[in-house]
Amino acid sequence: MAPQKDKKPKKSTWRFHLDLTHPVEDGIFDSGNFEQFLREKVKVNGKTGNLGNVVHIERLKNKITVVSEKQFSKRYLKYLTKKYLKKNNLRDWLRVVASDKETYELRYFQISQDEDGSESED
């Protein structure tokens, strides 16, 4: 039988970014207010407002970074972002899109103007 080695758990961190550039520059989105919303709503061990030293939320101009030392779902971050957009009546204009593996971006909905096919056909 092979000798057992002491297994030390790896210190892995989860790091996700939210790019809020376009809505913040247009003045319809307040990144400071959103950062405060995340601090209040993120759950750690089933409790909100329990970030402690486990989850860190940082804001740099138009980007918010969430760093977690426990497992943290990117999908949960998207859920909270959509919840904030709905609360502030921005859900009709903005959507949350994954731009790469660790980044979400807020983009405007693309509304195509189809003026030729208007409903005034007689």
UniProtKB/Swiss-Prot annotation:
One of its GO terms (molecular function) is structural constituent of ribosome. GO terms for cellular component: cytosol; ribonucleoprotein complex; ribosome. The keyword Phosphoprotein applies. The modification Phosphoserine is found at S112, S118, S120. Keywords: Phosphoprotein, Ribonucleoprotein, Ribosomal protein. It comes from the Eukaryota. Pfam families: Ribosomal_L22e (PF01776). One of its GO terms (biological process) is translation. Belongs to the eukaryotic ribosomal protein eL22 family. This is Ribosomal protein eL22-like 1. It comes from Mus musculus.
